[in-house]
């Protein structure tokens, strides 16, 4: 048994040693003459997709390449491309009774024609979310949703799905987060919503909003403020000294007059 095992191991080693030589021999790798003369069309250049999400287009150039590596009969064509069909969410905040429109179209869809696509809308009423389990069908088959006007009950998340009619392939999904606010509930005036420190910062003052410290003037304004402070202080001190001097003079004059009368 030991002898048989030894012979088997030695035979395996010999086979492993000579197998690469057999595989790489010219006879094994011989290429037929017809295959050597074959010509194939390969893509030599392609642009990126025109959009990052949804249906887009790209330019592709292909050429015939032979055994000599020379490119012949090159052609360029415009092809559809789809990088990602989920296009995120757009947020909108409007006032009640304001006319508004949600638009699911894109330039590439307009180029091909919206009649080649199917538009389906769904709504998650009253919340802003991308959880597809919360959406219910919304009766609309147009690429637009128009609110004439919008009411608070129209708030929610609207989902637009775009499919190609030729194969019902989903090529785009876009979410719209819509908030409709009563006019008396909130004032959207930006300036009126600022705090005192924020207003000072808007006017050019150096304000540390993170630690709620007192506002600091810029360098040139600090110098002006310092000069004004020194001037005011000097004026006050000078006025006090003048008053003291006048009081002494008037006091001395009054005393001399009294002595003269005596």
From Swiss-Prot:
Keywords: Cell membrane, Disulfide bond, Glycoprotein, Immunoglobulin domain, Membrane, Signal, Transmembrane, Transmembrane helix
Domain of life: Eukaryota
CDD domains: Ig
Annotated glycosylation sites: 45, 211
Domain Ig-like: start-end pairs: 83-171
Record lineage: Eukaryota, Metazoa, Chordata, Craniata, Vertebrata
Disulfide links within the chain: 104-160
Residue spans crossing the bilayer: 226-246
N-terminal signal peptide: 1-30
Cross-referenced InterPro entries: Ig-like_dom, Ig-like_dom_sf, TMEM81
Cellular location(s): Cell membrane
Subunit and partners: Forms a complex with IZUMO1 and SPACA6 on spermatocyte cell membrane required for fertilization.
Membrane topology qualifier: Single-pass type I membrane protein
Organism (species): Rattus norvegicus
Name the record gives this protein: Transmembrane protein 81
Secreted recorded as keyword: no
């Amino acid at each position: 048994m030991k002898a048989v095992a030894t012979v088997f191991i030695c035979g395996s080693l010999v086979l492993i040693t000579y197998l690469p030589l057999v595989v790489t021999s010219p006879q094994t790798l011989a290429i037929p003459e017809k295959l050597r003369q074959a010509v194939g069309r390969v893509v030599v250049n392609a642009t990126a997709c025109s959009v990052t999400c949804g249906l887009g287009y790209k330019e592709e150039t292909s050429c015939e390449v032979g055994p000599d590596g020379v490119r012949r009969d090159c052609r360029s064509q415009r092809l559809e491309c789809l990088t990602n069909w989920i296009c995120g969410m757009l947020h909108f905040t409007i006032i009640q009774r304001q006319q508004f429109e949600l638009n699911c179209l894109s330039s590439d869809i307009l180029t091909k024609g919206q009649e080649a696509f199917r538009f389906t809308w769904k709504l998650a009423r009253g919340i802003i979310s991308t959880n597809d389990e919360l959406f219910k069908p919304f009766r609309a088959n147009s690429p637009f949703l128009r609110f004439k006007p919008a009411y608070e009950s129209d708030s929610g998340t609207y989902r637009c799905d775009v499919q190609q009619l030729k194969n019902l392939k989903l090529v785009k999904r876009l979410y719209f987060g819509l908030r409709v606010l009563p006019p008396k509930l909130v004032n959207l005036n930006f300036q009126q919503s600022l705090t005192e420190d924020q207003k000072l910062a808007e006017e050019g003052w150096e304000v540390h909003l993170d630690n709620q410290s007192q506002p600091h003037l810029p360098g040139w304004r600090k110098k002006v403020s310092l000069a004004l402070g020194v001037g005011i202080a000097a004026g006050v001190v000078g006025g006090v000294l003048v008053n003291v001097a006048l009081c002494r003079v008037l006091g001395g004059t009054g005393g001399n007059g009294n002595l003269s009368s005596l």
